């Protein structure tokens, strides 16, 4: 009985520690080391946009060989990361308790609810349901739907604002316009006061 509050506190601390690693554990995808402008993609990897990023990168390198392209995961809000991390740990704890057959409600002096009795009679199904239901919620918390593009730290496309991915033609047109604009700005004489 004494270990229950301590283990809950320890589990919560582990969840917060693993979710607080913000960008430290995020793998950056650098496709080439060039000297030109920097095109940066922030994408939702769990949404399947990594393949789109790789296809766009190949096509853009063929068209603009001097461009630098980087891609990284667009992280959700910290609250959602903490919820997903907590669910991940809680899921493992709950599956362990189901497999061991220990009644946590008896430790608290409560009568076990019907769903707990069912989970003890059907351990495999109960563990599968906990695993898949928890994974569904975790994925929902971690999915941002983002496909954000910046050129030299200037936003040029946002799927979060537009609601759709840019076509390759749209992306090339945007890059052409941005590069022409920056070339035009570089050729202007400095303003004297």
From Swiss-Prot:
GO molecular function, one term: thioredoxin-disulfide reductase (NADPH) activity
Residue ranges of the TM segments: 83-101
Post-translational modification: May contain a selenide-sulfide bond between Cys-44 and Sec-47. This bond is speculated to serve as redox-active pair.
BP GO terms, sorted: cell redox homeostasis
Signal peptide: 1-21
Cysteinyl-selenocysteine (Cys-Sec) cross-link, renumbered residues: 44-47
One GO cellular component, as annotated: endoplasmic reticulum membrane
Membrane topology: Single-pass membrane protein
EC number, as in UniProt: 1.8.1.9
Superkingdom field: Eukaryota
Entry's localization field: Endoplasmic reticulum membrane
EC supergroup of this enzyme: oxidoreductase
Major location (coarse): endoplasmic reticulum
Protein name (Swiss-Prot/TrEMBL): Thioredoxin reductase-like selenoprotein T1a
Organism encoding this protein: Danio rerio
Lineage: Eukaryota, Metazoa, Chordata, Craniata, Vertebrata
This protein's encoding gene: selenot1a
């Amino acid at each position: 009985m004494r270990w229950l509050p301590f283990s809950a506190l320890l589990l919560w601390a582990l969840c917060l520690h693993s979710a607080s690693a913000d960008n430290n554990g995020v793998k950056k995808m650098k496709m080439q080391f060039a000297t030109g402008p920097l095109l940066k993609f922030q994408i939702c990897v769990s949404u399947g946009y990594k393949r789109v990023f790789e296809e766009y990168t190949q096509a853009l390198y063929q068209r603009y060989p001097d461009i630098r392209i980087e891609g990284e995961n667009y992280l959700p809000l910290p609250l959602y990361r903490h919820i997903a991390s907590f669910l991940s740990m809680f899921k493992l704890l709950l599956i362990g308790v189901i497999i061991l057959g220990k009644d946590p409600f008896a430790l608290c002096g409560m009568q076990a609810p019907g769903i707990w009795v069912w989970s003890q009679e059907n351990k495999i199904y109960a563990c599968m349901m906990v695993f898949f239901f928890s994974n569904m919620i975790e994925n929902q918390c971690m999915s941002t739907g983002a496909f954000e593009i910046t050129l030299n730290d200037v936003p040029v496309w946002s799927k979060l604002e537009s609601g759709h991915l840019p076509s390759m033609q749209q992306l090339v047109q945007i890059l052409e316009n941005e590069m022409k604009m920056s070339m035009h700005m570089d050729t202007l004489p400095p303003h004297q006061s």
